[in-house]
């Protein structure tokens, strides 16, 4: 993976897009083994994933540097009443159906502090997309890769202000990403 430029891609994603601040309360949805954690400043990190093995590995690797939960962000964190400055949803949306993604965003919006942000990154279908990128998308295990409009529709009905970015230079191989930054503009 790192031969594809993933290390540089994660650094760039964290520094230029995610932009966490020291002390932020951050939720990492679909965190896997928490590979993003070494790239983050000191903050209050919670990673959640359905895969027990990923969470067990993250706990072994990072110990008390974060809180690692096996579960579903849409359900399990609601009951705790926690709120977050920053919610990262990385390479997850293209693996879930529209109705599940819409429910996820509704739940995440309730977990977001005023002026907090949800940041997503996924692969995307684009018109006139390079052949190699289309091939990589077809080979991806995610069956819900969307167009930019398709990703934006997932946030319809939320009260979030959404900005999108398209990147085609994050990895060393030709690959197109869509980034959505959804901000909770409420002040209370």
For each of these PLM feature ranges, what is it?
Residues 91-95:
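Short catalytic micro-motifs in class I SAM-dependent methyltransferases
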Residues 88:
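A conserved beta-strand element that flanks and buttresses the S-adenosyl-L-methionine
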Residues 1-78, 96-103, 107, 119-188:
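Class I (Rossmann-like) S-adenosyl-L-methionine-dependent methyltransferase catalytic domain
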Residues 112-118:
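Short glycine-dipeptide loop
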